[in-house]
Amino acid sequence: MNHDQAVLNRVWCNTLLEELARSGVEHVCVAPGSRSTPLTLEAEANPKLTLHTHFDERGLGFLALGLAKASNKPVAVIVTSGTAVANLLPATAESGLTREKLILLTSDRPIDLVDCGANQAIQQQGIFSSHVESALNLPSPTTQISLNWLLTSVDNALAKQRNVGGAIHINCPFPEPLYSANSAEMYAEYTSSISGWKSGTACYSQTFLPNQVNTQPIAPSEYLGRKGVVILGSLDIEQATKAQQFATALGWPVFCDPQSGVTSDWKHYDLWMQSDVAKAQLNQCDFILQFGERVVSKRLNHWIKSQASSFCSSQYIVVSPDTHRINQDHLPQTHIVADIESWVSEQHLPTLLGQHAGWAAPLVEIANTVQQLALAQISNNDQLTELSVAVDLSTRLKDRELFVGNSLMVRLVDMLSSISANQVYSNRGASGIDGLVATAAGVVKANQNPLIMLIGDTSLLYDLNSLALFTHNVTPMVIVVTNNDGGAIFDLLPVPEQQKQSLYQMPHGFSFEHAAAQFQLGYAAPETLNGYQTIVEQHFEQGQGTLLVEVKTPPEQAATLLKQFSAMLIEALA
């Protein structure tokens, strides 16, 4: 048999990518590079795969993360060797916490070119450490190893990911040459061992893991007599709606994190929990049932800790499909690893009757007071602030999706917004400010639904070049950047006053008009709330593509207004 290493490299990649496609991969994110040629060309040649490109591997990883969030399917990423691989670490760390399925296909130099001074060669094996669920270090393509081995090895890694989510790393060392005009037919005899697989459509091998929760560790009789609270963390709309039905059946209060995409009569809890009257009522709770994870509100997390610390494990229940620990304060807890919708259905909602239904009804009036005060603040004046943007969000979303950034904005949304039946996306695993724009781009590419993104100025600066991902976007989208000239979140934290500006907030003095122009995006900088509302609505009703709306506010304004509002609220609830 004649040998052509470039062709053999592509034969291996053709087999690998076809198996990924059969396993549910539809999207492949590709960065430029020569060493990744076998993967890139075979991905392009596979009609089952849709390719997305970006010149920045760090942004590419977050683009894949957004695609995986929105599609709920595994997404592959192809990069060349060297630091290109290292740039995938931030998105990989996030997926390790939030369980989106990424498949990292990293091209590498062959082993004899590592640790010997060869160009663009770093130690890539194990580079993602514990942030990936599994790592498969492939040998360089050779006819001495069968394609049957390649398929079963890939399938084994995919089976682990299918069960627990997260990322898997497949490192692919390709010897040169990387380019050839010869046909794969020259390796027909070598590929004959998988001819049956090639002529079919199924995966080569499959692994099915049994459901470990055959009987639920908690029965309705254990909670029907309780004064319970239901907490909704990061969920999709279907899960959140089902969990709300459970709380309604029992007559229990439900606290909806903005990541759940729904609201309840007990909205704005982060604010009214400052009231002693409200806390006295809430502290009657003797049972907490949490669906999902990663609650934004620090006050709610503190209340869970103080309340559940005296509970036994059967009084604090967390239901989540995530097998990883969801217990940041190490409380007595029962974690039920289950599909949320299925678990709620198994509780037989029509037969449930809570013995203390309505026990938290007085808190509804308190929540309504907060909402009325918040709405009054924006209706009595036309001032455009971070707080007014958060309050207005409830009206602005309509049937649009939301991507909310980290730091100050997600906290203001948690406090002041009332999101109802909207799909909400965020990066609240590691809660970094890097890659937010790229992640939102992935969401838009996957869903192609109108979307509003709320992001801070420092976060946008961090991921500015990912605006290139929206240059050719036609789906109506508005990126709202609140520009307070630095990290305003530090106005809410007890950082040293003397070093607050220089070491924490780091004022930059930039605006984003020219950034929008560089990436061919629409741009507006409204000066009033009414102007902001009009601009956003006009874009969604008449336009297409991406509009960058810059809301310029003075430094420290958000913290000052929030403190004033909290003082007014405490007085009103006294």
Curated annotation (Swiss-Prot):
The keyword rRNA-binding does not apply. GO terms for biological process: menaquinone biosynthetic process. Pfam families: TPP_enzyme_C, TPP_enzyme_M_2, TPP_enzyme_N. Its cofactor is Mg(2+); Mn(2+); thiamine diphosphate. Disulfide bonds: none annotated. Keywords: Magnesium, Manganese, Menaquinone biosynthesis, Metal-binding, Thiamine pyrophosphate, Transferase. InterPro entries: DHS-like_NAD/FAD-binding_dom, MenaQ_synth_MenD, MenD_middle, THDP-binding, Thiamin_PyroP_enz_TPP-bd_dom, TPP_enzyme_TPP-bd. Pathway: Quinol/quinone metabolism; 1,4-dihydroxy-2-naphthoate biosynthesis; 1,4-dihydroxy-2-naphthoate from chorismate: step 2/7; Quinol/quinone metabolism; menaquinone biosynthesis. GO terms for molecular function: 2-succinyl-5-enolpyruvyl-6-hydroxy-3-cyclohexene-1-carboxylic-acid synthase activity; magnesium ion binding; manganese ion binding; thiamine pyrophosphate binding. Coiled coil: none annotated. Catalyzes the thiamine diphosphate-dependent decarboxylation of 2-oxoglutarate and the subsequent addition of the resulting succinic semialdehyde-thiamine pyrophosphate anion to isochorismate to yield 2-succinyl-5-enolpyruvyl-6-hydroxy-3-cyclohexene-1-carboxylate (SEPHCHC). Homodimer. Belongs to the TPP enzyme family. MenD subfamily. This is 2-succinyl-5-enolpyruvyl-6-hydroxy-3-cyclohexene-1-carboxylate synthase. It comes from Vibrio atlanticus (strain LGP32). The gene is menD.
